[in-house]
Structure formats: C-alpha cells, structure tokens
C-alpha cells in the first residue's frame, strides 16, 4: 500500500521527459521565423543577395534564441540532477516555466521581423525574464522543501547564473525603450556571467 506522503510526490524523470520534449519542439519551431524571401519580378544575384541581407535580423534572433534555449535546457538538467523528488507546487512552477519556453519561437520571430520597434523587444525581454524567474524558483523552492540530494558546486553556480540572468533580462528590457535595436545583444553578458559564477565557487 502506497503511503499518503509518498503519493504527494512525483519522480523527476517524468517531468524531465516533458521538458526535453517541449525544448525539442520550441527549438525546432524557431526556424519558422526564417522563411525564404519571396521575390517578385526579375531576378539577379544582387537582388537575391539583398533579400538575404534583409534576413540578418531574423537569423540573429534565431541563433540568439536557440543558444539561450540551450543554456536554459542545460541549466534545468544540471539543477534536476540534484533534485530527488517533486511535489505539486514544484510541478506547476515547471509547467509555467515551460509556458514561457514555448512562447520563445513567437517572441523571437517578432524580434527578428520588427527588432527596431519597442514592443517586439519588450515582448522578447519579458519572455526571457519570465524564464529566468521561474528557473530560479526551481532552485529556491527545492532547497526550501529539502528536495535536494546535495547542494553541489554546480547547483550553487546555476542559482547564481539564474539570478544574474534575471538582472540581464531586466537591463535588456530597460534598453528596449532607449537603445531598442541593441537591447537583445545584452544577453552576450551571459558569457562573463558564467565565468564569474565559476570563479565564485572558490570563495563560497
């Protein structure tokens, strides 16, 4: 007979399988924002080259979003390596997190198509901020409920990176209103953020 306490928890494997599936779909859908341009009239190498040149913002949005999704997937994987079980609250934290993940193809496509305007940048950066917040809530809630096998160095690093990413996305959101076309480039700060988080391991 299953104990009532045990029935309130779920193995992490089922959630991780769902996460893998959602990420596979979201990362694949990104390419839909990069359609082959339709050219009316006569064709020439110059005209075709110009049409592809106009796709650079779309290509940038695709690559940026793909790499960010890869970072999120890897962070979630590393975090859940140390989580031994989940309850209903942690499950729904992840479900809402996945909702933000599946919106990325839309926000990335909007950014690529209308990146010089404020609203698409706001949508993309709010999308990123939501992902960062709920990724951090995973670690915060799991630690508070003692769901962690061991708070390893890697786990602590992921917590720091999640917090840092929230601030980067907030900064990018603020840039949306001033340096609109450049706001999304701030996510390059993830590179030094990871290096700093790694260095902090020797102090904490």
Task: Give the ranges of each region predicted by the language model.
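Multi-pass alpha-helical transmembrane bundle typical of ion/small-solute transporters
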Residues: 2-204
């Amino acid at each position: 007979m299953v104990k009532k306490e045990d029935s309130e928890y779920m193995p992490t494997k089922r959630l991780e399988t769902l996460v893998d599936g959602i990420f596979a779909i979201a990362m694949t859908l990104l390419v839909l924002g990069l359609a082959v341009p339709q050219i009316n009239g006569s064709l020439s190498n110059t005209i075709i080259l110009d049409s592809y040149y106009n796709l650079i913002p779309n290509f940038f949005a695709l690559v940026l979003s793909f790499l960010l999704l890869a970072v999120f997937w890897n962070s979630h994987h590393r975090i859940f390596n140390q989580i031994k079980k989940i309850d209903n609250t942690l499950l729904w934290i992840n479900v809402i997190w996945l909702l933000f993940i599946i919106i990325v193809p839309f926000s990335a496509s909007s950014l690529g198509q209308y990146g010089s305007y404020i609203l698409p940048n706001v949508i993309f950066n709010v999308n990123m901020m939501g992902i960062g917040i709920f990724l951090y809530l995973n670690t915060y809630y799991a630690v508070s409920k003692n769901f962690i096998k061991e708070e390893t160095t890697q786990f602590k690093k992921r917590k720091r990176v999640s917090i840092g990413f929230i601030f980067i996305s907030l900064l990018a959101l603020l840039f949306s209103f001033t340096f609109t076309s450049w706001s999304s480039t701030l996510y390059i700060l993830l590179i030094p953020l990871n290096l700093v988080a790694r260095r902090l391991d020797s102090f904490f």
